Design a protein with these regions (language model features):
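Extreme N-terminal, non-catalytic leader segments
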Residues: 1-39, 96
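Short gly/ser/thr-rich secondary-structure transition/capping motifs
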Residues: 17-20, 91-94, 127-129, 147-151
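Walker A/P-loop phosphate-binding motif and the immediately C-terminal alpha-helix
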Residues: 26-71, 75
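Short loop/turn elements that form and flank the Walker-type P-loop nucleotide-binding site
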Residues: 29-30, 59, 104-105, 140-142, ...
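P-loop/Walker-type NTP enzyme "switch/lid" segment
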Residues: 38, 65-140
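Short acidic, S/G/P-rich loop/turn micro-motifs used as interaction or catalytic elements
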Residues: 43, 117-119, 153
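Structural motif
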Residues: 62-64, 108-110, 145, 167
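Conserved catalytic-core segment of NTP-binding enzymes
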Residues: 130-133, 137-172
């Protein structure tokens, strides 16, 4: 049963990657974007994303770390950041991208993930286009955007795959 389940997850990831390779709808220039995702919960995507971000800061890059995990945000906890705004607030228009970003350790800029309730699966394509449009406006404050999407086999992950310059899949 587990082998079948793992194959199903891997198939979903491959299909998402294929679909995003064809979809080039996010053609507005923005800082280089790395998306980190995995095949299942709890395999360390947040830890890897935070470490990528810290290493990029050591190389004097300006980094925005976005926690886009749809069900729980761990990046802020790992970085000991407490900020009133989250990704949910940016997506629903309750705050701007700039307002949502908090200062973190090592000079990281962090957009915290969801804390109380999961992201709604019915967020529209327009919502994500608006979100990525706001990311493009970060040219003045970011050289690199690192996005932790957690379990990568969600419908919303497609938007992140499509916008990424580089995708890092964490496997077990």
């Amino acid at each position: 049963m587990n082998d079948i389940n793992m194959r199903d997850q891997a198939d979903k990831l491959r299909n998402l990657a294929r679909k995003s390779a064809v979809d080039s709808s996010f053609d507005t220039p923005c800082p280089r974007m790395i998306v980190v995702g995995g095949g299942k919960e709890g395999i360390g995507t947040s830890t890897l994303a935070v470490n990528f971000a810290i290493e990029a800061r050591r190389q004097e890059q300006r980094v925005v770390l976005v926690d886009a995990h749809p069900t729980r945000g761990d990046v802020a906890k790992l970085c000991h950041v407490d900020h009133p705004w989250t990704l949910s607030d940016v997506l629903t228009g309750q705050c701007s991208m700039i307002e949502g970003i908090a200062s973190g350790p090592h000079g990281l800029q962090i957009l915290s993930g969801v804390q109380k309730k999961p992201l709604s699966e019915d967020l529209t394509e327009f919502t994500y286009r608006r979100f990525f449009n706001q990311l493009t406006r970060l040219n003045d404050q970011a050289d690199l955007i690192i996005v932790d999407i957690g379990e990568a086999a969600s419908d919303t992950a497609t938007y992140h795959w499509s916008a990424a310059d580089l995708v890092c899949l964490v496997t077990t």
